[in-house]
Structures are given as structure tokens and as C-alpha cells.
Amino acid sequence: MENAYICDAIRTPIGRYGGALASVRADDLAAVPIKALIERNATVDWSAIDDVIFGCANQAGEDNRNVARMATLLAGLPEEIPGSTVNRLCGSGLDALGIAARAIKSGETALMIAGGVESMSRAPFVMGKAESAFSRAAKIEDTTIGWRFVNPAMRAMYGVDSMPETAENVASEFAIGRDDQDRFALRSQQRAAAAQESGRFTEEIVPVAVAQKKGDPLWVAKDEHPRATTLEALAKLKGVVRPDGTVTAGNASGVNDGACALLLANERSAAKFGLRPRARIVAMATAGVAPRIMGVGPIDAVRKVLRVAGLTLEQMDVIELNEAFAAQALAVGRALGISDDDERLNPNGGAIALGHPLGASGARLATTAMYQLARTGGRYALCTMCIGVGQGIALVLERV
């Protein structure tokens, strides 16, 4: 079996909903980090790319009709290079990376690009066709996040709780209090701010040129979602599900825009094109859980991937646990034996501070983990995420 190595990884800044990247189409946004890979790796014969696999959770708007293929062409790769878009909702970007790695490990491919994209700001409203002629029962659905066009059988079998409702379910079932959630959220903001101030994200971010109505483009070079806060300020926020709820806008991830791309190669291709392997993709695993507590999906996914990798949680030097909600992140961490303030856990902040552009987030986790391993000299990193409709995904990296 071949080894699959990450040789380079880069992402756009993460934009706020309706923020600096809101005017950029998803396919154009996805092309940005691919172009950056091309520019940063001049020794590569890009006609040798076997496939481009991108994750995207929406695909109802400008990201329709295989956004990976669109981005491949828009980035200037040869038209002979194929592209495929995968959708495991929030886990799409990490899934794309794992799929690409498995293709290389099997020997079927040698050089791949994997990543993800999401423009939640530009997610469209959609309307289904009428069930009968001349019907006036048309319903418009917002595709930004969560359920739409719900199957009545799914509603009857599992319910269709919104994402914040699933977090409240987790908080209740796993006894995660409001104060603990707010403290976790504050740590995320503080760590993200420290990472930004120290320039830790510089190597992994490619600035995005955003066209303006007049004059020069606006260059966006910094994550837009982090915000200064205090425990007192967080405590004043009302629950988003119910007034006495524990899940608030302050201890939940954002609705965001962003894209990320990674260059993968086997050992021969890396040597042939003068690439430096930075991390080996050790293993990936997925798991299913009840949709109403989808946030705890990483528990079984992590246990499974560690079993496949033959490793333990104690061997992980970096743990990138996607912070969809503080409630679910705490529930996952505690179930796995990770302390709430573990220094290995999201050392540069997580999605509560940085944002969660759904299809891009998994690729972002792997990118940030790779650079963190290089900075600290750690050996192993764990990346894991919960997934809407009740799944979890986990991936292990080893620094080379």
C-alpha cells in the first residue's frame, strides 16, 4: 500500500455571513486556493493531477453542477483534469481529503487535490415544484443551513430538530451547563485572537481579491469572524432555541464563507515534482448517531479511527475538534477523556471563533493541524467533526 502525503495546504480567510467574501461566488472562491497551490508549487506538472475532490454542503446555488469541476477549470488547470464534489454536509471537506488519500493509498492515483468550499452568504432560496396543477401551496426554503424539503417519514421517525435544537439536546443529555459552554467559547476566541496576533495563520491563508464597484479590489487577508468578548458579555446573550436555553450565538459556530485546498501525493510523485511531504494521512473513519444528538458523532468516529490507526488519544499532539457548538464539543471531549481546557485541543481557536463554512471546514481543520504540528514538532494530529443528520468523521495525520 502507498502512503498518502499532504505536500501543501492553503485556505482563504473565513468571511462572516454577509461580510467581506459575500460577493464572491462559491465556484470562484473554490478556485482561489487551487490557484494558490499552482503558484506555490512551480515544479509540478499540473497535467499529472489525477483528480480534484472538493466537499460542499449546499450545492443548490452557484455551487451547483459539480463545483469541484468548475473550480478546477476556473483555477486554470488543464481541462483534462477531472473533478468531483462530495457532500457529507459539515464533514464534506474532511471526507474529500480522506477519499483522495484512499485513492493514493490504493495505488490508483498518485497526485491529487482535495479540499472544500462553502458560501453560506450566497446560499439561495429555493422553491419546489407544485404537487398538482395550479397549486398555490408553493413553499420557499432557505438553503443556508439545516433541513429543507423534509421527508414526512424522516420527521415521523427521527424528528427534524434544527442544529441549535440538537445542541440543546446534547447539553441536556450530557449535562453540559451554560457556564461551561460560555467558558469554552471564550477560550476559542482568546486562542484565535492569539493565533492571529502572532501570525500563526499567515502561512495557511491566501488573500482574496474582492472586486469593488469602483477602484481597486479589496484584499481580504484575515479571518473575519473572531470577535473580542468576555465571560460577562457571553452570559448576557439569550438562548437561540428558547429564552432559558443554554445555546447562544456566542457559544455556537458562525455562518460563514471560505475555501481550502490541499495537494496530496505518493512518495514517487512527491520526489518527481520536488514536493516536500509535510504530513502523512494515517487513517479516516466515520460513524452514525441519532440525528437529534448529531453533535456527539465524533465520539464513535474518533474511537474507530484510533483503532484503525493503532494509536491512542494520548499519542495525539494536536486535536482539532470542530466547534459546531460548545455543548457538543464539550460532550465529545469529556466522553473521550479530553479536559475542557486541554492545550492540545484547538490550540488556535475553533469554529466558534473562526467560523464554520460547512464544506470547507474539514479541510481547514487538517490544514491548521498540519501547520501546528510543524510549529510544535508534534507527531500526530486528530481532526474530527460532527455532521448534520447524525454522523461523525475523524482523520489522523502524522508529521513527516
Task: Pin down the residues of each PLM region.
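Active-site pocket-lining segment
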Residues: 168, 212, 282-353
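Conserved catalytic cysteine-centered active-site region
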Residues: 24, 56-112, 141-147, 157-163, ...
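Conserved active-site "lid/cap" helical segment
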Residues: 1-71, 75, 82, 166-178, ...
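N-terminal extracellular/periplasmic Venus flytrap/periplasmic-binding protein-like
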Residues: 11-12, 23, 27-32, 43, ...
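Condensing-enzyme catalytic core mediating Claisen C-C bond formation in acyl metabolism
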Residues: 1-24, 145, 230-296, 300, ...
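Flexible glycine-/small-residue-enriched beta->alpha junction loops
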Residues: 111-169
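Beta-strand segments within the central parallel beta-sheet cores of soluble alpha/beta enzyme folds
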Residues: 46-55, 82-87, 112-116, 180-187, ...
